[in-house]
Amino acid sequence: NCGLPYYIGGVIEKESSLLLATPELFRTRYGIDVLLRHEVYSIDPQQRTVGVTNLVTGEKMQMPYDELVLSPGAAPLRPPMPGVDLPGVMTLRTVPDANAIRRYIAEHKVRRALVIGAGFIGLEVAENLQLAGIEVSLVEGGSHVLPPLDAHMSTYVDELLAAHGIGVEVGKIAKGIRRCENGRLQAYNDTWNSVEADLILLSIGVRPEITLAQNAGLRIGETGAIWVDEHMRTSAPGVWAVGDAVQTTNRITGQSTRLAMAGVAQKQARVAADDIAGRPAEFRGVVGTAVLRLFGTTISMTGLNIDTLTRSGDSDYEYVDGHHAQHVGYYPGASPIHARLVYRRSNGKLLGYTAIGKSGAARRTDVVAALLACNATVYDLAEAELCYSPQEGSPKDAVNQLALAAVNNLEGLHPIAHKDDINADSFLLDVREPAEVLQAPYPGAVNIPLSQLRERTQELPHEQKILVFC
């Protein structure tokens, strides 16, 4: 289902491209029988049977098992509010959902769409609807788009959406949807009305499908997902569970979490299969790595961000921002990666990383993700030996340079100041060249170009803290 937004937009043209395997392939290659149009309605862990309904004939049967694996996934949230079941109010989770949206767009000649929810799926759908020639608006209940980002990094996404003509409203939580006199749909609450649209797509998250497990008496974790141990075993002997429906552990915080990601589900499935087959295997948790490609720009992240840390009451962190190119500047095509590295102020332990750029962002995020899983520090990242050629990187890679800045801060060699540190007593020293200052002047700063700084140090105050930026 990761490809569904691109199927709606026509980037993926054929439904068959989304189907990775057929029942015949499973039977001939693996000797596995696949029962389509059959629904499991109950599990009896004591008797080791599942109740199954044949949806074609209506026949019910009890099927025995030796070992059982649950992989029910997650369902899109559809809040119980007025108008949520009106024609044209839709969700996207399955191929039939995507086909229904495509049909509705064609049959109703949709010209304007409203996407409620500006997370990963919401943004991907918004992009693909816009590329298909539909005017798109986004509504997000949180304080900024793409909530897994911190507020500062999300501003790059704001600029990207604005540049491509997608309207965004944040801090708006719909309490209902109504049909207007002109036939269009409109979301609303007590103090706000959305734009009118021909189609509303709800993309406000998913909930784990736990009904079967709950009815069977399986333990449900504090996150509302199925509890499993490190071998993917549930609380019932002979029953394993994997994927979007299960609870896992954040490897950085040690706390329980849910992470509905395809890569996580794949790894959990292998662990469960190994455990059933008697091979030693453990799923050690997640660090939270994700990526989105939006209008040619990559938005990637791993670990914790400063908003998450602040909400949890954790103040033992520091961060450094950077805008290094994906490869050396003298080779054509260099473009910046806007990045933020978060680490422990007390010991330099890596906590998280976000990278946004036209090229190379995901590669750097993967490097940090791998180190996060190893409990590494900024010292490890600073010394990481990464690929280099003029076309592919720099001798000191973009991610090395961020780590080196963090090391310099930890060691007191070059302390970092943030925007919040600026006050009336600060002396702001802008060391950019005059042409650069004209492009983006900073109010209240004194410009002494770096090329002239050594000869003009007498112009600097001795009684004020000097904050330098470039």
Protein language model regions, located:
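Rossmann-like dinucleotide-binding cores of NAD(P)H-dependent redox enzymes
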Residues: 18-19, 112-113, 120-178, 261-264, ...
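FAD-site-proximal beta/loop scaffold in flavoenzymes
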Residues: 85-109, 183, 194-274, 367, ...
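Mid-to-C-terminal Rossmann-like scaffold of FAD/NAD(P)H-dependent oxidoreductases
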Residues: 245-359, 391-394, 398-424
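Catalytic cysteine-centered active loop of the rhodanese-like fold, especially the PTP/DSP P-loop
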Residues: 448-450, 454-470
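A Rossmann-like FAD-binding core segment of flavoenzymes
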Residues: 35-52, 56, 63, 131-228
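AMP-binding/adenylate-forming core of the ANL superfamily
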Residues: 50, 55, 68, 198-201, ...
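Glycine-rich dinucleotide-binding loop and its adjacent helix/turn
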Residues: 70-132, 167, 222, 228-230, ...
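Beta1-alpha1 glycine-rich phosphate/pyrophosphate-binding loop at the start
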Residues: 1-39, 126-149, 289, 363, ...
